[in-house]
């Protein structure tokens, strides 16, 4: 079975949700028999990740936190991964970024340095929250939690990035349809977030099939990575 590494830390409210999603993704990995390990808190640094990659040799890396087009950040918002600089440490693994914007440059750079596959978003990953700070009970964030749970489940159960992508798109479509029927005044904002996230999904890797957004889908050797997030608070 695969070795899955979860990388996440809490710096602010968005990363509270990111860390929660990372834990849910790791839970899906364990359900099908994969082994998991976590790099959390103050250990989420460039040196910490490199040490984990060398010692644990994960097949899949889940990276959850703030990101930009060419960077993923960790403890204290310090840069953990930077494209064309230290992303070669991900060689031979696969990654899933729960993060903003990493699909623009960092994901392609990692693949060019030897990563087998990596997924991310080409826009800011956005969602609505109820302002209470408890992701598991947040009715507005539930649609976004469902995406991470069901898409990662499809990946771990089938070993196919294509299934990850297709299930993810289906979840977005179903959640959009649900919110279109809602009379909640926040519903239009939730729908806008769903549409943005759905349009920004990308998966890159050697031999990947093209998808409408320009990324790719492919069979997976185990690894998840996660990046950065943007959130919208319901006032």
Give, region by region, the residue ranges found by the protein language model.
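A domain-level signal for caspase-like cysteine endopeptidase catalytic cores
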Residues: 1-64, 96-97
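Solvent-exposed loop/turn segments at secondary-structure junctions
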Residues: 10-14, 43-46, 66-71, 100-105, ...
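Short, structured coil segments at secondary-structure junctions
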Residues: 32, 91, 112-114
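A short, glycine/acidic-enriched catalytic loop
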Residues: 67-91
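Ser/Thr/Gly-rich flexible loops in soluble cytosolic domains mediating phosphotransfer, phosphorylation
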Residues: 82-107
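Active-site-proximal C-terminal subdomain of hydrolase catalytic domains
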Residues: 103-210
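A short, hydrophobic C-terminal helix/tail in secreted or cell-surface proteins
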Residues: 213-229
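C-terminal membrane-anchoring or membrane-association module
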Residues: 229-235
């Amino acid at each position: 079975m695969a070795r899955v590494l979860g990388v996440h830390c809490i710096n602010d409210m968005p990363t509270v949700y990111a860390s929660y999603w990372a834990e849910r993704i790791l839970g899906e990995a364990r359900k099908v028999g994969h082994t998991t390990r976590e790099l959390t808190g103050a250990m989420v640094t460039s040196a910490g990740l490199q040490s984990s990659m060398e010692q644990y040799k994960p097949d899949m890396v889940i990276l959850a936190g703030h990101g930009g087009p060419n960077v993923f950040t960790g403890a204290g918002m310090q840069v953990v991964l930077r494209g064309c600089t230290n992303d070669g440490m991900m060689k031979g693994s696969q990654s899933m970024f729960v993060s903003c914007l990493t699909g623009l440059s960092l994901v392609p750079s990692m693949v060019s340095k030897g990563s087998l596959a990596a997924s991310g978003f080409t826009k800011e990953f956005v969602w609505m929250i109820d302002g209470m700070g408890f992701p598991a009970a947040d009715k507005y964030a539930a649609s976004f939690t469902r995406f991470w749970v069901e898409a990662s489940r499809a990946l771990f159960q089938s070993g196919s990035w294509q299934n990850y992508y297709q299930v993810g798109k289906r979840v977005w479509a179903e959640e959009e349809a649900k919110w279109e029927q809602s009379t909640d005044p926040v519903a239009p904002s939730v729908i806008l977030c769903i549409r943005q996230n759905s349009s920004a999904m990308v998966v890159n890797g050697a031999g990947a099939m093209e998808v409408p957004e320009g990324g790719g889908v492919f069979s997976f050797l185990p690894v998840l990575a996660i990046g950065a997030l943007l959130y919208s608070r319901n006032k």
